[in-house]
UniProtKB/Swiss-Prot annotation:
InterPro entries: ClpP, ClpP/crotonase-like_dom_sf, ClpP/TepA, ClpP_His_AS, ClpP_Ser_AS. HAMAP family: ClpP. Belongs to the peptidase S14 family. One of its GO terms (molecular function) is serine-type endopeptidase activity. It holds the Pfam family CLP_protease. This is ATP-dependent Clp protease proteolytic subunit. It is found in: Cytoplasm. Its EC number is 3.4.21.92. The keyword Protease applies. GO terms for cellular component: cytoplasm; endopeptidase Clp complex. SUPFAM superfamilies: ClpP/crotonase. Cleaves peptides in various proteins in a process that requires ATP hydrolysis. Has a chymotrypsin-like activity. Plays a major role in the degradation of misfolded proteins. One of its GO terms (biological process) is protein quality control for misfolded or incompletely synthesized proteins.
Length: 196
């Protein structure tokens, strides 16, 4: 996130209150996932999901995504929490959802996965690098193949595409417009106007 965070002032019968913009959005059950997905960002997103679940498990949560992707295990912590809580999580792509960002976009509640018209969505296989002895590199290669299989299985389920198509399409960077992502099954609708 940017180092500059705007503040908003709300007037109530008890006076004025100042919020940073992200805290104010959280009051409306909006979470911003912006930037590279790493353990720190994932911990913040998970905490916000759990907080909103505790506040009201019957109300939807809106996860806005603008991300180039990031660490698979960090993304899985967000994914698992989205599935663990009772509240539906609606996903909305603003800007781009690439790699793990696209994966999370596809994991929103059925019928509640959206993208703005000029969004860019990209899926591919997980990236990794290994150094060390040959045995260590082999262990890392097996693990990345295991993660790739999990990601592809979940994408196939979310998109209703055949696993073989997902495997082929994720072999290299596969870019889509918002309309193409809808046709592919990654999202349910391209938003022209706010749905709130």
């Amino acid at each position: 996130m940017s180092s500059y965070i705007p503040y908003v002032v709300e007037k109530t019968s008890r006076g004025e209150r100042s919020y940073d913009i992200y805290s104010r959005l959280l009051k409306d059950r909006i979470i911003m996932l912006s930037g590279e997905i790493n353990d720190d960002l994932a911990a913040s997103i998970v905490a916000q999901l759990l907080f909103l679940e505790a506040e009201d498990p019957q109300k939807d949560i809106y996860l806005y995504i603008n991300s180039p992707g990031g660490v698979v295990t960090s993304g899985f912590s967000i994914y698992d929490t989205m599935n663990y809580i009772k509240a539906d999580v609606s996903t909305i792509c603003i800007g781009q959802a690439a790699s793990m960002g696209a994966f999370l976009l596809s994991c929103g509640a059925p019928g509640k996965r959206f993208a703005l018209p000029n969004s860019r969505i990209m899926i591919h296989q997980p990236l990794g690098g290994a150094r060390g002895q040959a045995t260590d590199i082999e262990i890392q290669a097996k693990e990345i193949l295991r993660l790739k299989a999990i990601l592809n299985d979940i994408l196939a389920k979310n998109t209703k595409q055949k696993l073989s198509k997902i495997e082929k399409d994720t072999d290299r960077d596969f870019f889509m417009s918002a309309i193409e992502a809808k046709e592919y099954g990654l999202i349910d609708k391209v938003l022209e106007k706010s749905f709130k």
